């Protein structure tokens, strides 16, 4: 199978390359907490030799409740991202929700993310693609893996072939998500080998059907992440928090920051093992 590789500074993102950790916070809660979380990720990934990209949102525009915290906004968020880049030398990924956000965000961060709920909005997809930035496409929960190729084609038609695909679970009835492990391979095939990554923490969301916020199953984050890494992926997308029970968004799915090092060590061991195997073609 063809495997495309995206070069981002000294980081190679590809399905047959050592996995990249896309890690950080769900949403920027404060400048100080962002610094704390990023510093921990840098410490752990440098110790373990894992390529690292910081992730967080400056605005959670799709919160269920009008009363839920959304973030500091684009202007303040970009200032925080710039400080993280200058302080720690990290690459940064964040999401956009409006066309007007695309260019100013792409001028600061290294990867712009297309949210799952917006992944079929052609005008937004085209505006993102025309920035020339690397695009991370979150597969919508309502879309089959095979349909992701249409989104990749929209981006390619704008002259941008720097695309990462991210699975964050698929609707399983009402208010629940499951991860189809066969879907990762389908996404690789229909995209002609785009790097595929796994958002393990969002895949653990589960909703109270009458509640105003998502629940989660962070007690299962290690098991689900192990399963995904055994496929052979370009990266893992992970959210952590110093105190998940106090997080302003998606705390029930977040990995406690104190558990980051043993968690990443296990993921690296699985990735190293799986990618040491020779690929077996069982198609004929």
Swiss-Prot record:
Protein name listed in UniProt: 2-dehydro-3-deoxyphosphooctonate aldolase
NCBIfam families xrefs: KDO8P_synth, PRK05198.1, PRK12457.1
Source organism per UniProt: Histophilus somni (strain 2336)
EC number per UniProt: 2.5.1.55
Subcellular location: Cytoplasm
SUPFAM superfamilies: Aldolase
Swiss-Prot/TrEMBL GO biological process terms: keto-3-deoxy-D-manno-octulosonic acid biosynthetic process
Pfam families assigned: DAHP_synth_1
Pathway annotation: Carbohydrate biosynthesis; 3-deoxy-D-manno-octulosonate biosynthesis; 3-deoxy-D-manno-octulosonate from D-ribulose 5-phosphate: step 2/3; Bacterial outer membrane biogenesis; lipopolysaccharide biosynthesis
Name of the encoding gene: kdsA
GO annotations of cellular component type: cytoplasm
The family this protein is said to belong to: Belongs to the KdsA family.
GO MF entries: 3-deoxy-8-phosphooctulonate synthase activity
Main location: cytoplasm
Catalytic activity: D-arabinose 5-phosphate + phosphoenolpyruvate + H2O = 3-deoxy-alpha-D-manno-2-octulosonate-8-phosphate + phosphate
Keywords, ordered alphabetically: Cytoplasm, Lipopolysaccharide biosynthesis, Transferase
